[in-house]
Amino acid sequence: MTKKITLVSTPIGNLKDISLRALDTLRDSDIILCEDTRVSQKLLNHYQINNKKLISYHKFNEYKMLDLIDNYLNQGLQICLISDAGVPTISDPGQILVNWAHENDIEVDIIPGANALISAFALSGYKGSFYFGGFLDSKKQQIIKQISLLDPKVSYIFYISPFKLVYTLEIIRDLYGEEIDIFLIKEITKIYQKYYRGTPDKILNNLSAPKGEFTIILKLKEKKSIKKNKYEQFSKVK
């Protein structure tokens, strides 16, 4: 008997953004571990996936649930993990479970799908590599620590609360002024999806009633180097 846990990616807004494999896995699972069973039930109802045992699995009970999950696996039950939106473990519960599974020779599989940070980076138009820092902190000194010493060759992606958005943009402006470009997008894949791109001041001037889920990308502007002609001093006419 092979013990196995499957991570299933779910839509981040538009319920149509779910794969056929994800739906098949949800239908075939005996136990569905959910960040919030109420949110997950809406998705299952939409696709008429009925009579499933949903178990609340979140950051406050991750360790406590391991013995119960192990018991289910020993019974030969099929288990999958979903978060409220997107890929499990990415700024969501699940890393403890996955590490535990690896340490106990339990197979882990994943059904890929919609992801806010990848979608935001694709829409930004920024080139090069990127770094994902999870959620930006709410305290000023921690925010400064998170966004200090940026490399202009790297895009820095964070999730951010709408309640701290203006406050954070002002901190970024005070730190970098016009020397940084920002791509800010809210409600990815939803009806009210909207994005902004520009300097902190430009975005602050255009931002209205920040509500919803935001992803922010910071891109430090590269300083253009002026190449000097080493023969210039010899070419001047005297």
From Swiss-Prot:
The keyword Transferase applies. InterPro entries: 4pyrrol_Mease, 4pyrrol_Methylase_sf, 4pyrrole_Mease_sub1, 4pyrrole_Mease_sub2, rRNA_ssu_MeTfrase_I, SAM_MeTrfase_RsmI_CS. Its main location: cytoplasm. Keywords: Cytoplasm, Methyltransferase, rRNA processing, S-adenosyl-L-methionine, Transferase. It is found in: Cytoplasm. Pfam families: TP_methylase. One of its GO terms (cellular component) is cytoplasm. Signal peptide: none annotated. It catalyses: cytidine(1402) in 16S rRNA + S-adenosyl-L-methionine = 2'-O-methylcytidine(1402) in 16S rRNA + S-adenosyl-L-homocysteine + H(+). One of its GO terms (molecular function) is rRNA (cytosine-2'-O-)-methyltransferase activity. Its EC number is 2.1.1.198. The keyword Chloroplast does not apply. PANTHER family: RIBOSOMAL RNA SMALL SUBUNIT METHYLTRANSFERASE I. NCBIfam families: 16S rRNA (cytidine(1402)-2'-O)-methyltransferase (TIGR00096). HAMAP family: 16SrRNA_methyltr_I. Catalyzes the 2'-O-methylation of the ribose of cytidine 1402 (C1402) in 16S rRNA. Belongs to the methyltransferase superfamily. RsmI family. This is Ribosomal RNA small subunit methyltransferase I. It comes from Mesomycoplasma conjunctivae (strain ATCC 25834 / NCTC 10147 / HRC/581) (Mycoplasma conjunctivae). The gene is rsmI.
